[in-house]
UniProtKB/Swiss-Prot annotation:
Protein name: CRISPR system Cms protein Csm5
Entry function: CRISPR (clustered regularly interspaced short palindromic repeat) is an adaptive immune system that provides protection against mobile genetic elements (viruses, transposable elements and conjugative plasmids). CRISPR clusters contain spacers, sequences complementary to antecedent mobile elements, and target invading nucleic acids. CRISPR clusters are transcribed and processed into CRISPR RNA (crRNA). This subunit might be involved in maturation of a crRNA intermediate to its mature form.
Source superkingdom: Archaea
Pfam families xref list: RAMPs
Length: 418
């Protein structure tokens, strides 16, 4: 005998299935890396203030679909659709909603908002708004929006994201001093193409995971986050075509500050000294911070100098010019976090450009990346057309407002709190 479920339970289950199905129908989006909270031990020695220079987005792999929000008067109203459907107390209306949604999908796009759906069955959408957020996305743009990472609906910046950026900066500095080692790994045919990145990291840090000295660098998740969050619009600027393509909407932090705690154990600097042939022996927080600053800014400066050689939109160019001037003041750490930093901020590619003015290694690098592109025709064609380091990457994701490119994404300034 079949078990009879309560009406509301059936409806809740049905709406969950409906949302999952619609999300699959509309578009399948690759999951971004999940960021996990970095648990920090007691005995923190440094408090660092972080200030946004340009908008930042760190994703959690989830999105707001058109079933989750509607935009009105410059605000995105986030709604609880499951609660609304549960309140209907009528399976026929649930089925009506399902049919309405399916019949309004055109070219993989849903031409309805959550408000349209609720009003179609006599519900007041404002009764189900769980929060509001400023929106720079126009109300007629029915689109999916990438979610900012959060825990229990509270935004945060993962310490792991900052630590990862510092790790990349260190690897850059290591090969800046040991370029022949980098070239040897790239040349080594015994190392599989897709393993070369990992091998570069292991060679610079440790081939034995338990001996990874970055375990001595501990960074907390954001504390006292005071930020302005909005639905924002980004687009990819195509350097060759000198125009925009591929719009991406996201929930971004556009302004604000937050604090982090950093603990650096002595073993971290002992390993840095061994690897970089330095003689660091910091006795206080200021000296420890200065060492991190030198590592990070050497990398960030090279990235920005590379970016300034590219054909950027006017306001983006000005943003980079100011950023470079600020880095040269040498009074803070400058890092790029999250989405939009792209290829340059996640690899040692700018290092090759920096150390190869005569393009002696470029053909080798080009061949390597053509091979790594595999079945990605667009990526392969981009490399086939590249005649210099500056010909790649071919696109750059930038923050767009009122149809103008305003700034690159993800840059922060970090200062020591005394």
């Amino acid at each position: 005998m079949l078990k009879t479920y309560p009406l509301k339970m059936m409806m809740t289950s049905r709406i969950r299935i409906m949302k999952t199905t619609i999300n699959l129908i509309i578009r399948s989006i690759p999951m971004e890396n999940q960021y996990y909270s970095h648990l920090i031990q007691r005995g923190i020695t440094m408090e660092v203030k972080c200030e946004l220079i340009t908008p930042i987005f760190i994703g959690c792999g989830e999105e707001y679909s058109q079933l989750d929000y509607f935009i009105e008067d410059g605000l995105a109203h986030i709604i609880d659709l499951e609660k609304a459907v549960s309140d209907l107390d009528d399976l026929e209306k649930v089925d009506y909603i399902s049919g309405l949604i399916v019949s309004n999908i055109d070219n993989n796009r849903l031409n309805l908002t959550a408000k349209d759906i609720l009003e179609s069955v006599g519900l007041n959408p404002y009764d189900y708004v769980i929060r509001k957020i400023e929106s720079e996305i126009f109300s007629n743009k029915k689109t999916r929006v990438k979610k900012f990472i959060n825990q229990n609906n509270t935004y945060y910046i993962p310490g792991s994201s900052i630590k990862g950026a510092i790790r990349t900066a260190y690897i850059f500095n290591y090969y800046d001093k040991n370029l022949p080692e980098l070239l040897k790994i790239l040349d080594d045919r015994n190392i599989k193409l897709h393993d070369k990145g990992k091998e570069l990291e292991k060679n610079a840090i440790s081939k034995d995971i338990p001996k990874d000295f970055f375990k001595y660098l501990k960074i907390s998740d954001s504390l006292n986050l005071e930020g302005e969050f909005k639905f924002i619009h980004t687009k990819r600027w195509n350097y060759r075509k000198k125009k925009f393509d591929v719009p991406i909407n996201m929930e971004g932090m556009t302004k604000g500050t937050f604090s982090i705690n950093i603990k650096i154990e002595d073993e971290f600097f002992k390993n840095i000294n061994k690897r970089l042939k330095t003689n660091y022996n910091p006795k206080d927080d200021e000296k420890k911070f200065d060492i991190l600053k030198n590592l990070c800014n050497n990398f960030s400066k090279t990235v920005v100098e590379f970016e300034l050689k590219k054909n950027n939109p006017v306001y983006v160019e000005k943003s980079y010019e100011k950023l470079l001037a600020d880095i040269n003041k040498d009074d803070a750490i400058y890092l790029n976090l999250g989405f939009g930093g792209g290829f340059l901020n996640k690899t040692v590619y700018p290092l090759l450009w920096k150390n190869d003015e005569n393009h002696l290694y470029f053909r080798k690098i080009k061949s390597l990346f053509i091979a790594l592109s595999g079945g990605n025709k667009n990526l392969k064609n981009a490399w086939l057309k590249a005649n210099s380091y500056l010909d790649f990457p071919t696109t750059k994701t930038v923050y767009v407002k009122n149809n103008s490119a305003i700034a690159p994404l993800g840059w922060i300034k970090m200062t020591l709190v005394e």
